[in-house]
Amino acid sequence: MIDLKRNTKGEYVEATGLNSQKWRIYQPNQKDDFKISRSRFGEFKDCPRCFYLRLVKGLQSPGMPQFKLNELTDTLLKKEFDECRKNQKPHRKLIEDGLEHIVPYDAGITKIINSKKEEKEWQIIDVWRESKNHGLKYKFKDTNIILQGGIDDVWLNKKTKELIVVDYKSQASPKEVSQDTYFDKSGYHGSYKTQLDFYAYLMKGMNLEYGISDDSYLYVVNGLDVEEGFNAEIKFSETLIHHKIE
């Protein structure tokens, strides 16, 4: 499925196949900073030609429908972990997996100027999550390239005093989620390793108060096909998948 081109009013407009937002197109030798997101970085690894055509030539790939149910599970997980963050207590799944020494990281509060030019207080974790205008950012060496990405969560290992990169993943598969098979090379899950590595790289360049752990996790929730039917409720299994940062 692909979506049709619409304007901000929801009206159908001509689809030219070219990006009309010039700031998204890199001009050779430009002096202004240019942002490259985590998804674009992943595209560069998978298809350098696609990356070049999109960011330099301005070609637009067909849009895809948004997965709102996945977004909702992300939102609910963030609320759950934020409650643990506020109390600096390990999440129930961390306790279940023998990781009581890990808690959601409380990075404190900062002030952000919003689109209305108003100064607002934000939790720093929410700044890091907001990929559109903020997120994790790191200027690549002596260039004008800014690598940027919105992270789902950051945990703190209280034993090692290191920060842990975390991403939430939602799915519905009849197969059991397992550490042994999750990163099977025949599947697309391998790209999630790049995602975790990318976030860790950004954080290492941000000069944070703690070091960045080589351990990272995917918090995978898998929708279950249960015999009793829907009944206005979906049940999920929850699995922590470990990845050693490369």
List where the protein language model places each region.
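Metal-dependent nuclease catalytic cores that hydrolyze phosphodiester bonds in DNA/RNA
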Residues: 1-162
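Metal-dependent nuclease catalytic regions and adjoining charged, substrate-binding loops involved
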Residues: 2-20, 27-29, 35-36, 200-246
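A structural signal for short, well-ordered beta-strand segments and their strand-loop junctions
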Residues: 43, 52, 155, 164-168, ...
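Conserved catalytic cores of phosphodiester-cleaving nucleases, focusing on short active-site segments
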Residues: 47, 147-183, 199
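Short catalytic/ligand-binding loop motif for oxyanion handling, primarily in non-cytosolic enzymes
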Residues: 52-53, 60-62, 172-177, 225-228
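Acidic, metal/cofactor-coordinating or nucleic-acid-engaging core segments within structured domains
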Residues: 185-209
